[in-house]
Amino acid sequence: MTQLAIGEATPHGATYDGHGVNFTLFSAHAERVELCVFDSRGNERRYDLPGRRGDVWHGYLAGARPGLRYGYRVHGPWQPAQGHRFNPAKLLLDPYARRVEGELKDHPLLHGGHDEPDYRDNAAVAPKSVVISDHYDWEDDAAPRTPWGKTVIYEAHVKGLTYLHPELPQEIRGTYKALGHPVMVAYFKQLGITALELLPVAQFASEPRLQRMGLTNYWGYNPMAMFALHPAWASSPEMALDEFRDAVKALHRAGIEVILDIVLNHSAELDLDGPTFSLRGIDNRSYYWIRDDGDYHNWTGCGNTLNLSHPGVVEYACECLRYWVETCHVDGFRFDLASVMGRTPTFRQDAPLFAAIKACPVLSTVKLIAEPWDIGEGGYQVGNFPPPFAEWNDHFRDAARRFWLPRNLTTGEFACRFAASSDVFKRNGRAPGASVNLLTAHDGFTLRDCVCFNQKHNEANGEENRDGTNSNYSDNHGKEGLGGPLDLMERRRDSIHALLATLLLSQGTPMLLAGDEHGHSQHGNNNAYCQDNALTWLDWQQANRGLTTFTAALIRLRQQIPALTGNSWWEEGDGNVRWLNKNAQPLSADEWQNGPKLMQILLSDRFLIAINATLEVTDIVLPEGEWRAVPPFAGEDNPVITAVWQGPAHGLCVFQRG
């Protein structure tokens, strides 16, 4: 058998140098590693990796070229109680694979064994890693580097955003190409968003349970290959990388940043009954958090948890993030279940991965957004992430809904959330932009569903409506469902307007869910993770154009208010904010805690937000001076107001002085 040259221990993965391919694989506990290459007929040839430096195995295959399909068989102990599950009968994906051929099917041969190893060979059905050659002309591409104070994030799904868009060419709808098409770029600019945050684009798999039910994982939070683009949204798997980069380049030219939702907390190997296709067979003990009995700590709810305190796994995570920044020019990341990143196993602000990111000149300068919780003990860590992380602020989400969709909430609590939750984020040198304010996100009700449904309706998910949260803080305004009489529809519209204004005129970084500006509904499904269909795809032909115009006007207004774009904490007497009651007097202590939901917020001494969140029409006395409503609140007849605004129930209006 032909032997490999020793090669080099870096760079990690499979690297083509024009004459052959260097292969590396991290495994601290392996005893032997075989590189397996496959020809066009599926015939397999095996080579031992001859080199080892520390915990990295390596070898060089002369004459190998891009397009070569490969995998690994890793030999070592089968000691489940100690966390070791080596099984050379199972072909394994390279964790650094830039492209993967084949899907992860629900197949018995992909199971590595539970108490005893499954020695049936799986090469015939296992996904294969593919060597690529990477050459791309970025031309004059430059990162927009939008300041946090001016950032407006738009969370979207690659397919769902454009699949039903009638103005896009049919063949590119629902693809990476569509993201950078002039029609979409023009829409983003007209709306005013500055950053497109994409649900996971790294290759993912549908869980076996979903496959057996005839469903698919739509959102993508079941990662299979962290360095490879999901191929389903490309014209061909070979073109995925370039088509994604074309979209990034087009968006950058328009000044729009691209943020990736990334899943550095678990893998699609799931629990011990899940498939063995990569990390479990390469070095289970190193890659995952293992309990004393050899099973997994399941702090993710997905069966396993990556051990991001292990030096080898920290290096893997950082190289993955750098790859997306350096190779694909993305501008930042939103980290799913990000508390896992700080587990040692307890959460620490100086956890190894946080320290590595902060020390990295590439990663420390891009936008980093944490979903600051996981499901393990001590997993809720809102406000506790170290700089330079921003965080999703669920306090804002819940407070905004409770304020406008009648629940008990004090004026003081609302004001605190409006002011970037300074009680949570004003620490460790962090600025207001660290609070990523949201009303809705991919998981949960859409904004329209928040005003149409009191209960979740997740029957289509096949779990008898048990999945999804029951804490929605929603209000159907008297009738469950989308329809209703005119007066009910008007009340729902007013609530949506008030919620959007609260989001887009609050201090902090606003995040808008794609489709909320259209009036998109998921018909009460608040956990549509497995609905790759019209329930989740945005219907552009049915979009509420008036709501889109209203949203765009709010974003333009936001960018005109220095108190919101300055990204500095508001201080007493600094001219940024004054909190007034309905009589234009400073709020009293009793009004902060017990008063009705009536207030005025004066920003930058010239923009006044008048709020009536009560159930009655109420006169609100404006501060001294001349005030005129500003778009989107100004009507055709927009007189100067010098005394009183008659605030409608659940109403909000913004005025400008002079």
Swiss-Prot record:
InterPro entries, alphabetized: GlgX_C, GlgX_Isoamylase_N_E_set, Glyco_hydro_13_cat_dom, Glyco_hydro_13_N, Glyco_hydro_b, Glycogen_debranch_bac, Glycogen_debranch_GlgX, Glycoside_hydrolase_SF
Residue(s) at site: Transition state stabilizer: D443
GO molecular function terms attached to this record: glycogen debranching enzyme activity; hydrolase activity, hydrolyzing O-glycosyl compounds
Record's keyword terms, sorted: Carbohydrate metabolism, Glycogen metabolism, Glycosidase, Hydrolase
EC number annotated for this UniProt entry: 3.2.1.196
Metabolic or biological pathway: Glycan degradation; glycogen degradation
Disulphide-bridged cysteine pairs: none
Catalytic activity: Hydrolysis of (1->6)-alpha-D-glucosidic linkages to branches with degrees of polymerization of three or four glucose residues in limit dextrin
Top-level taxon of origin: Bacteria
Ranges for region Disordered: 459-484
List of catalytic residues: D336 (nucleophile), E371 (proton donor)
GO biological process assignments: glycogen catabolic process
Keyword Hydrolase: yes
SMART domains according to UniProt: Aamy (SM00642)
Function summary: Removes maltotriose and maltotetraose chains that are attached by 1,6-alpha-linkage to the limit dextrin main chain, generating a debranched limit dextrin.
HAMAP family: GlgX
Family label: Belongs to the glycosyl hydrolase 13 family.
Protein name: Glycogen debranching enzyme
Species the sequence originates in: Salmonella dublin (strain CT_02021853)
Lineage: Bacteria, Pseudomonadati, Pseudomonadota, Gammaproteobacteria, Enterobacterales
